[in-house]
Structures are given as structure tokens and as C-alpha cells.
Amino acid sequence: MKVLVSAYACYPPSTEMCTEEDKKMADGEALLGWNLIGQIVRSHDVWVITQARNRRGIERALQRGGQSALKAVRFTYIDFPGWPEALWDNQISNHFYYYFWQILAFFRARTLHRIVHFDLAHHLTFANDWMPSFIGAFLPVPFIWGPIGGGHTTPKALRQEYTWSQRLGDYYRMTVQWIGRNVLISRRRCQKRAKAILVCNYETKHKVPARWQDKVRLFPVNSLSPENFGESLVNRPEDGVFTILTVGRLRQLKGFGLAIKAFAMFTRKYPSSKLEIIGDGPDERRLKRLARELKIEDRVLFSTWLPRNEVFRKMAKCDVFLFPSFREGGGAVIVEAMANAKPVIGLDTGGPAFHIQPEWGIKVAPTSYDQVLGELSSALQRLFLDGNLRHRLGEAARRRAMDYYLLDRLGERLEKIYREALLPT
């Protein structure tokens, strides 16, 4: 089968020798694009349209070897010439750029289709429900959309974590999402034409109109390889210190401020504990200041960006993984912690609400600010006092990760969706 994949975000995993640009480009969604394309090409002839910024990383990874299947993929790189680099990290300009990039991608796809005659088109990334795929809306071939997200929002109770400018940014985001869902005809055509709509969390599922709900399939935006799995046995560290780990880009919406405040409440009762934060980003200075103000700077350890294999080693040694991100569509680090047999504490919203279930973790409903802090602290206390519970949740988390998130399993599920899409209606 000849498959056309639109993957605006597609970048190989970062390595120890990677540049700062590689670290920024190889985020969760870009890894999703790279990994799932590797699964699709195992069974099909694949053409991929992606942005030109990805070219260097993709070609370097293919030259290094170890990606033999992906060498069969025909990559096409497109971008607007002369787009200023300074605008890449600007949310507003990126929304406009991505919208018009989709138009470029459609015209390139139409040209390719006249030559190749595709059997199926798949919009893989970016993963949001409110921005249309022009390939999906207008290219005359069966179409798969997703996995998409974007249905999640910042809980009102936690908006006080934002600065005033971040609150304005959040309102801007909600406004453009409303316009996308209610005004853009091309977005409605995507829903109508799609043979399957893959969604990565429950909130996004609920954004799909009732008449198209029969097309919806829950499908994660995070995946695991066999080497990501740690030992199944959960052990306390030899030094007897209860270790809480959290990982991610240091941005306010990731909830690291909540993690520090909840840990401060917990460690007053149980001082033989530490919180380790791995990551870098614009919120680092504020977070370090917060730890000093709460007089726990000696128990909060900050580690800069680390390669994935180093992060997995840290996960293997911790007791609990804490991830109170309050605007998260996916949450790759949650799945990675589960693979390392760690119980996860997170918020009942977005991707974490999908990943974490009572059988293998603890979810906190974001009802009010003080309630969130109190319940996060109580969850830490509960897991600190009950080693058997930690072990039971950790083992269940590892089984869930093996059953649901293993990349080969996701490839099998995607192949089934492809086959169903081509069945006569």
C-alpha cells in the first residue's frame, strides 16, 4: 500500500553528542512522528512530508545507521523561505506558520499524488484537533487523522500559577481553538472525510461532534521501545532517602512549582526525602528561588538536561515519579516512569488523566489550588508509608506500559486501523 504521511514534527531521538537545537527539536511529538513512521514503513511504501528544519537531524540519523527501515522512506522537506528564526519559539507566529505550512503541504501532496497515486493519507503531526489538515480535507484518498490532542485546557483552579502574560497567552490559545473548531470549514471537512480519528486524551474525544464519535479511537502520542523498560523489582535506595523524581521542560504549565510546594508540605513531616528535578527552561530561576523561600533548597536537586538513557537510570533509582503538569496533552515521561515500574502521581487532566489509572498510580482532581497541593502531599505520604503499595502500583504500571505503549504494539494497532480504513463502506 502506498501511504502519504504528513508529519510536520518528525525528529530522531537525541544522543549524548547532540546540539542544543537537537534537544529542542526532539520533543515528544517529533519522536512520535519518527517512531510511528518507522512502524508504518515496515508494511507499506511510505512518503513523508515534513518541515525543512527536520532535514539535518533526519539525514544524520539515517547516516549513523541503526534505522535501516526508515532508509526506505521518501522524505520531502518544505518550508516558507526566509522565515525568521527568531519567530520559531513564538506561539502566535507558529500558529499562523503551521496553518499556511499545511497549505504548502497540500499542494506538494497533490503533485505527488498525480505521480504516485496514494492508497491512504495520514496526518500524523502536529497533533491538535482544532487546526485542519488540508491534505485530509482536500486530497481525494482515504484519510486517517491523528493521534490528535488539544482538547485539554488549564484548570481554572491552577491559573494562578501563571504570570499575567501567560494568562493572556492561555486566553489567546482558547480563542484560536474556538475559532478553529467553530469557523474553519476545512477542519469540519477533516472530521467528515476521516476514516478514523485518533485522539490522545478524553477531553479531545469529547471535542469531536456526536455524529463522528463512531470514528474516534483512543491512541497514545507516547511510545516505548524494549530497551526503555527497567527492572521489574521496585527497591528502596540503599541510602534510605525517599527519592521523588520529576522530569520535563522547566515551564510554568508543567507544574514544577506545584511539585516543590507539595514536597515542602511532605518533607516537613518526613525529612529523610529529596525531590530531584531534571530539565532546563525559562522557569528554572523562579523554581530555585521558590525552593529557597520554602527553606528546602538542600532537599531539592536540580539537574540540567540529560540524555534519555541517563533519565531512565534516574527513574530506575527513584521511589515515586511526580508529574503535576496541568496542561499536558500527552506526557511521555509518565509512560517512561511506568516502564521503570514506578508509581506515578499526576493530575486528573489531559494526557496524565489518560495514562494514570488507580491500578498503577494516583490522580488528583484539580478542584482548587490548596486542595491540589494537599492531595499531592498526601499521595506522597501514602506511598512513603506503604512500601507494598509502591511495589504493587509499580508492577502494575510496568505491565500496563508493556501491554499498551510498546512501539510494536502501537504499530500493530495502527496497521489494523489502516486496513479498516480501506474496507468498502
What do the PLM-derived regions correspond to, one by one?
Residues 288-306:
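Nucleotide-activated donor-binding/catalytic signature segment of Leloir-type glycosyltransferases, i.e.
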Residues 326:
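Aromatic "clamp/platform" in nucleotide-sugar-dependent glycosyltransferases that forms part
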Residues 305-306, 313-318:
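Short alpha-helical donor nucleotide-sugar binding micro-motif in glycosyltransferases
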Residues 343-346:
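Short hydrophobic beta-strand element within catalytic cores of glycosyltransferases
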Residues 1-70:
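N-terminal subdomain of nucleotide-sugar transferases
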Residues 176-232, 239:
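Donor nucleotide-sugar binding/catalytic pocket of nucleotide-sugar-dependent glycosyltransferases
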